[in-house]
């Protein structure tokens, strides 16, 4: 058992090292897209399933409340946070519409959709991205493995932050770190002296 614990830590560290080499440009571009959207008076919608839903809610909470320093609230909505809306849509329509319908209702040109999917193949996340494209929104996608179907939907203005791993647990750990990096970059760009 102790050896297995060391393997988990070692894999996580190796994935972090690989991500630190591969992802800074994509994370920076994702943060810039979000900052520009917020400066233009727009908002960030985010969604995910399971652990990705938790990362989505963590991002929205960090925008609305604060990340590490006190600052004004920033507009972000975790589409997976309202169980009444989710179950109403799932009950009346296909489950794959639970986020897409909300994107069509709430999304506007200039908004950002933060779409989080470990494999990039979750139908409800794919449908949300397709709806965001029709609303002229920018997509920042957090993926892993080969990026899945999600990667093929992204245009030149969109950003894929693909974790260099084929292990779901490692990808999800890195998604949380990436969300924290995005929050840090947004805060330090919009409020550069708040952490002083």
From Swiss-Prot:
CDD domains: SIS_GmhA. Keywords: DNA replication. One of its GO terms (biological process) is DNA replication. Residues 34-196 form the SIS domain. GO terms for molecular function: carbohydrate derivative binding. The keyword Iron does not apply. Required for the timely initiation of chromosomal replication via direct interactions with the DnaA initiator protein. HAMAP family: SIS_DiaA (MF_01157). Belongs to the SIS family. DiaA subfamily. This is DnaA initiator-associating protein DiaA. It comes from Pectobacterium atrosepticum (strain SCRI 1043 / ATCC BAA-672).
């Amino acid at each position: 058992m102790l050896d297995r614990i060391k393997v988990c830590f070692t894999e996580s560290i190796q994935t972090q090292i690989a991500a630190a080499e591969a992802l800074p440009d994509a994370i920076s571009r994702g943060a810039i897209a979000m900052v520009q959207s917020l400066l233009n008076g727009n908002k960030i919608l985010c969604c995910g399933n399971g652990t990705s839903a938790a990362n989505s809610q963590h991002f929205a909470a960090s925008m609305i409340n604060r990340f590490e320093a006190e600052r004004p609230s920033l507009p972000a909505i975790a589409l997976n946070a309202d169980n009444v809306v989710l179950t109403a849509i799932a009950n009346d329509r296909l489950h794959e519409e639970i986020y897409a319908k909300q994107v069509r209702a709430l999304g506007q040109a200039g908004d950002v959709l933060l779409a989080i999917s470990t494999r990039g193949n979750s139908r409800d996340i794919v449908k949300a991205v397709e709806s965001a494209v029709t609303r002229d929104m920018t997509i920042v996608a957090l993926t892993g493995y080969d990026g899945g179907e999600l990667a093929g939907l992204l245009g030149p203005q969109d950003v894929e932050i693909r974790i260099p791993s084929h292990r779901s647990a490692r990808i999800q750990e890195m998604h949380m770190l990436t969300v924290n990096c995005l929050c840090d970059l947004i805060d330090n760009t919009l409020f550069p002296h708040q952490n002083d």
